[in-house]
């Protein structure tokens, strides 16, 4: 009986070691130095943890990544208060690097700043994202997850592109799908061609259609 139990535990351990890792190893920092002191700052610690979980625990692709192949990325969300309850504007800085084969070095693949951030977040709010229904029930709340899902796909796309021409197209198309179905209204910007020449629309459009 003990022998059977030991064999079972060994097989379970071997199986767990073979499970595919998620694609991203993301660190998220939520900077609230420009948020009003009247706001409960503990909510942003909760948000930071929720965003890390959202990026790292979700399976973004059907590909298999070994633990040492995960894409290292840092996202800094800089927020400031608005006149609306639980609504914030600001920017996000996205940096990512991939491991260099057979070395301990990382090769940078993304360094980008997005100044078109407008989100709604209430502490302990569930971060829900459905790529078939990007807009969700509340545009501003959905804009938060749409924003991070978009950059998750862009990061994965640039990683794949670094290995082969057009290697990231499938993921850039996922990002473009978010653009095409993004939340709108409530002063949300960055998803439309007319929102400026440097935004999420043009980033996806240019990488897919100008090569």
Predicted features and spans:
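Short, charged low-complexity intrinsically disordered segments located at boundaries
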Residues: 76-88, 122-124, 179-189
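Signal peptide-directed extracytoplasmic domains
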Residues: 85-123
């Amino acid at each position: 009986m003990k022998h059977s139990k030991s064999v079972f535990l060994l097989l379970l351990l071997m199986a767990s070691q073979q499970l595919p890792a998620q694609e991203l190893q993301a660190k998220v920092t939520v900077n609230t130095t420009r948020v009003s002191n009247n706001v409960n700052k503990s909510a942003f610690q909760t948000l930071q943890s929720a965003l890390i979980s959202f990026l790292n625990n979700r399976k973004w692709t059907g590909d298999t990544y070994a633990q040492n192949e995960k894409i290292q990325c840092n996202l800094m969300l800089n927020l400031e208060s608005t006149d609306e309850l639980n609504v914030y504007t600001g920017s996000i800085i996205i940096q990512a690097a991939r491991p260099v084969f057979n070395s301990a070095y990382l090769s940078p693949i993304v360094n980008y700043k997005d100044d078109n951030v407008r989100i709604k977040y209430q502490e302990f709010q569930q971060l829900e994202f459905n790529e078939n229904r990007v807009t969700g029930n509340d545009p501003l709340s959905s804009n938060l997850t749409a924003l991070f899902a978009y950059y998750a796909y862009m990061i994965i796309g640039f990683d794949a592109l670094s290995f082969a021409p057009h290697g990231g197209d499938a993921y850039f198309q996922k990002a473009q799908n978010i653009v095409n179905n993004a939340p709108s209204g409530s002063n949300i910007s960055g998803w439309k061609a007319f929102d400026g020449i440097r935004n999420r629309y043009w980033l996806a459009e240019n990488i897919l259609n100008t090569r």
